[in-house]
């Protein structure tokens, strides 16, 4: 299962992403309430359909604030230029069995690689765009 970051969703909603579409068709996508929240702050069209579709996806385990702080300390995530929401996504991927994190954010991708949680479906599927 792949936890999809906001950056990937934005590209998909604007232009479409073949790799994400294939993962959705295969039932391999995880959502997270913080990603849904970030997307809800954008100008989604059609708003209700997009938000409901995201909410209907399987959800990653949501880490507590203490769990996130432990992940930050254990993996020395400070000073990498990632934000607290990013740290929550890393912790969620760590806590969700078999999950990996797909992002197009360079700093978050580096942190995901550091934790061996990075997913790059576009690189393996050959159908999507990567940056």
Report the location of each language-model feature.
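Short, well-structured N-terminal submotif of metal-dependent ribonuclease cores
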Residues: 1-34, 40-52, 58, 118, ...
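Active-site neighborhoods of divalent-metal-dependent phosphate/nucleic-acid chemistry enzymes
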Residues: 12, 18, 59-131
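Non-catalytic, well-ordered alpha-helical scaffold segments
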Residues: 33, 37, 87-90
